[in-house]
Amino acid sequence: MCAKPESVSASRERCCWPDEVQATNRNRTSRALQSGAAVFDVRSDLVRVRVPAFWARSAVWLFLGAMFFVGSAAAQESKKGDLGGLSLEDLAKMKVESVYGASKFLQQASDAPTSVTVVTAEEIQKYDYRTLADVLRGVRGFYVIYDRNYTYVGVRGFSRPGDYNARILFLLDGHRVNDNIYDGAYVGSEFPVDMDLIERIEIIRGPHSSAYGAGAFVAVINVITKRGRDLRANEVSTEAGSWNSYKGRVTYGDRFDSGLETLLSGSLYNSQGHKNLFFPEFNSPAANNGIAADADGDQAYSGFADIIYRDFNIHFVQNSRTKHIPTASFDTVFNDPRTETTDARGYLDVQYRHLFGAWETLGRASYDWYDYHGIYVMDYAGLGIPPYTENYDAANGSWLDFQGDASRVLAKRHKVTLGTEFRQDLRQHQLNYDIQPYSLYLDDHRTAWMAAFYLQDEYVIRKRLAFVAGLRSDWHKKYETTLSPRLGIVFQAGANTDLKGTYSWAFRAPNSFETFYSVSISNTANPLLKPERIRSWELEAAHRFGKTYHFSAAGFLNRIDDLIDPGIDPVTGNPIYLNSAPIQNKGIEWELGGKCANGLEGLISHTLQASRSIATGDVLTNSPKQTAKVNLSIPLVQRKFFASADAQYISRRRTVAQTDLGGYAVVNLTFFSRKLTEKFDISGGLYNIFDKQYAESGGLEHQETSIPQDGRSFRIKLTYRPHLSAR
C-alpha cells in the first residue's frame, strides 16, 4: 500500500513561541520557505528580529574572515615549535593522501584516474561531524536532502525523488553496503558504524561500473574503519544534544604479541526529536492546526567487530534504526506518532589477503541481510475520525557475495588488476497488509543472481604519463550482458601539476522495489523496466603551491539514458517507475585549500552545473545550479584545542510540484580538544548558528512540496580512555 518513504536530516521546532506569535507568523514563514525569501530570524522567548538577507550573508563571510585572521595569528605564534612536535605518522599524512576505492589497489590520490576527496578521522573530529551525511554536506559538489525520515545524497546537481541513494555505491572497508531490495544505503543515524570508528572516507566522483558493476553510477564512497592498533585502548564516549538527544559508545581495540588484532564496539542513540513541528499544508483544526506533536523521534543501535590475524580479516556489522515520521507521507494520518519505519542492516565478511609471488591477491566471501518494516496509519474513509487502520509494509533481503581480485606489475610499465564476482540473492521479499481488519495487498518473493569479470591496466607510457583502461562484463539473471568500459589518462605536467581525463560508461539495473512492488490502491509494478545507463566525460587539473596550498578545477559532462524515474501509470493512475527521456548533466567546479604544519587548514569550493531533459529542455527537480562550501579549522593551543567553522550554500531548486524552492546558507561552529587531560577528549558543536529557516524538496509521497529543516542546535561529546595498552 505504502511505498517505502524517502529522505533524511533533522527539522526545526517552530512551535516554541507564545501562541499569539505563532499565529501571526505561520503563513509568513511558509511563504518565505517556498519563495526562498532570505530572512534570518534571531529569536528569544519574546522577541523576533528580522535580519535582511544581505546583512546575514555578509555576517557569514565576515565571521569566517575573522576566524581566519585569528587563526593566522595563532599559527604565527606557534609556528616554530609545531613541526618538531609532529610524529612521523602525522608528517606522512600531511604529505600523501592514499586511496583504494578508485582502482581497487592502494595508490596516491593524485595518481587515481578520477576526481577524489579524502576526509580523515582528524577532520571528522575537528568539524564534529555527527553522521556521514554531515561529512558529505561539506564536500565539493555534494548536497544532502532530508525529508524527516531518510537522508538522500545528491552529486553535482543530480538527485532523483524515490532514490534511496541507489545511484551511489557505498562501501564499508570495500564491502558493498547498498541492500538488495532498494539498492539503498543510508547516511544518517542509520549508517552501520559509529563515526568515531572511521579512519578515512574516500569520495570518488563519477561512474565506476568498470570496477564495481551496477550501482556505481555517479560516485563511489568507501568508508575505511580503524583497526585495533589505532586504539590500543578501551574507550567510552557519551554525548548529549538538542531535542533530548543522547548517545553512548563503548569500544575496545588492541593488537597482541601473537599478531591477533581486534576492534569491538557498540553504540546506542536516542532522540525525542522536535516536540512540535509545524506544517502549513495541514493547518486546520482537524489536523491539530498543522502541528505534529511528539512525532519526530529517532532511535538506533549498532555493533561492529573487526578481527585480523595474519592474512585473514573478519568483519561483523549490525545496525538498526527506528524513525517516527511527522510529515504524513503516503497519505497517512497527520499527527499520529504511530507512523514509523525501522531499517536493520548487517553482514559477516571474511577476507583473505596474500602475496603470491608478484601477485597481490584478495579473496572475499560475505553473507548480508537487510530488514525493513514500517507502520503507516491510514484513514481510508477520509473522515478524520478514529479508529484508523494500521498498514504494515516490509521488505527482507539476504544474499551471498564472493569476490576475487589480483594485481601485479608486468613488464615494469603495466599495473594489471583483474577480478571476478558472483552474487546470489537468496531472498527478496516484499510484503504489505492491513493489520486490523486484515487485508493482504502484496506478498512477493524473488531470487536473483549476478556474475561478473573485470580487467584494468594502468600503462605508464613514460615517467609522468599514464594511460588507464578498464572493462567489466556483468551477467544478470534478468537482463542481458552489460559491458562497462573506462578510459583515463593521468599526466604530471610538472612537479606540482596533475592533469586527468576520464571517459566511462556505467549502468544501474532496476531493483526489486522499482520492478515488482505493486499494491492495487498504491503502486504499480513494472517488470519491463530496462537498466539505466550513463556516459561520462571529465577533465581535471590540480596544482600544489609548495607544501601548503592546493587548487583544482574540473569540468564534467554526463548523458543518462533510460533513467528510471517515478511517474504515473496512465491505466491505473497509481505511481509507477518508468524509463524516462535522456538527461544531460554538465558543469564545472573548483576547490582551493591550504594545510599548514601547525594544524591551521581551510578549504573553499564551488560547483556550477546545469541538468536538463534533452527531449524537453526542462530543468531537473532537486538540482541546485550552484553549491559552495567553506571549511576553516584553527589550532588555538598547540594542536590540542581546535576551533572550526564550516558553511554550505545551496542555490534555488525546482520541486516535484514544479515550484521554486529558495536557496540558503548554513554555518556551523565546532570545537575539539585532544587529550583535555591524559585520558579525556571533549568536542562540541553549534549547528546552524544563525538559526536559518530553510527547507528541502520532498518527494512525490509528500503533500508538502518543501520539508522544513533544523534550526540552531548543539551537541557536546566526552570521550574517556580508562586504559591504554602498553604494547
Question: Which residues does each PLM region occupy?
Answer:
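Periplasmic-side early beta-strands and strand-to-turn transitions of outer-membrane beta-barrels
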Residues: S209-S210, D230-L231, E239, T251-E340, ...
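Extracytoplasmic beta-strand/coil segments of soluble accessory domains associated
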Residues: V96-V116, A133-R176
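Conserved C-terminal beta-signal and adjacent last beta-strands/turns
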Residues: G253, Y301-G303, T341, R353-L355, ...
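Gram-negative outer-membrane beta-barrel transporters
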Residues: V460-F467, S552-I560, L578-T655, T719-Y720
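N-terminal periplasmic accessory domains that precede
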Residues: L132-V135, Y152-G157, I168-D173, G188-F191, ...
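Outer-membrane beta-barrel signature, preferentially recognizing the C-terminal barrel domain
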Residues: V333-L355, A395, L442-A448, N496-D498, ...
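Short acidic/polar hinge/loop motifs at secondary-structure boundaries
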Residues: R176-R205
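Face-selective signature of the C-terminal outer-membrane beta-barrel domain
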Residues: D306-T322, T342-Y479, Q492-G494, Y549-F556, ...
